[in-house]
Amino acid sequence: MKIVGITGGIGSGKTTVCRYLKELGVNIIDADEIGHRVLQNKGIRTRITDVFGNEVMNPDGSINRKILGELVFGYPERLEHLNKITHPLIEQAIASLLEEYRQKGIKAVAIEAPLLVEAGWLKLVNEVWLITAPKESIFKRLRNRMGLSREQVMARIQSQATDNERLKYASIVINNNCRFEDLKSCVQLLAKERLELA
């Protein structure tokens, strides 16, 4: 089974690349989505409130990701503490899905993980595709998609590895500074060549 890690900074276009891969029959594992599910785990919620206080809780007992994000982004020590709580369970869930796909004879899997390098998940993949985009495009996407201010976007960008750091591990670099049609064609070609998909 071919396993590719799709990584890059926030707003770089990882999800778009994964959407195109899914259209080609690649199974997608979204690490952020798994992370959101991990936050629903009662034991994890308790550990998070022990560290960050009850202010991160919604009235229904779930974690308020917006408030939690404000508390950790821009504060490396806090973010590291949160990651130590959540990353082991996320990795465990990814590994479990990969094993399930292996058992089913799945040919190709892509793991969408912005923190693939930082979380130490490189061991889960055969190769890394790095998605990059100009900063101004990222600011625009995140303002439109998430309603984040420039300062909030910068805090998130600075909490992640730089593209230069990720580049050390990348087999493929996709510069998402093009039209959707061109990006889709690029992904189709890479899927054919690297994942042996027709």
From Swiss-Prot:
PROSITE patterns: DPCK
Keyword Heme: no
Record-linked Gene3D superfamilies: P-loop containing nucleotide triphosphate hydrolases
Any one GO biological process: coenzyme A biosynthetic process
UniProt-annotated binding residues for ATP: G11, S12, G13, K14, T15, T16
Superkingdom: Bacteria
Keyword Kinase applies: yes
UniProt KW keywords: ATP-binding, Coenzyme A biosynthesis, Cytoplasm, Kinase, Nucleotide-binding, Transferase
All residue ranges annotated as the DPCK domain in the record: 3-198
Subcellular location: Cytoplasm
Pfam families, sorted: CoaE (PF01121)
Function description: Catalyzes the phosphorylation of the 3'-hydroxyl group of dephosphocoenzyme A to form coenzyme A.
Protein name per the record: Dephospho-CoA kinase
Gene name for this UniProt entry: coaE
